[in-house]
């Protein structure tokens, strides 16, 4: 998945504190220990810190952990995962899509909603 670098946020930001964020995935990919991402099919385990090097190409980022700054709308067919971008992480922000891409992320838990407990 490609992240477009916003004109107002051209440089990476270093997180001065843990940042709350959310990922979205399909309901059938979630299990008690983790989940599988929608686009890259990456297997995440809950409460584990994942690290990568950001892949930057001109005005886009081609490698990194994507997440949302606002909790997305959930349905019967998807689940929302609460995550943290840990303090000290390098990240970019795009306000048009309320989206982050970071070099570190910690998936914490599935967020409960009216469709599942």
Please annotate each region the language model reported:
Residues 78-115:
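Charge-dense polyanion-binding interfaces
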Residues 61-69, 102, 107:
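Residue-level signal for functionally critical sites in structured catalytic/ligand-binding pockets
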Residues 1-66, 77-92:
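ADP-ribose/NAD+-binding catalytic cleft of ART/PARP-like enzymes
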Residues 71-77:
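Short amphipathic alpha-helices within nucleic acid-binding modules
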Residues 22, 27, 109-117:
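Solvent-exposed, well-ordered amphipathic alpha-helical segments
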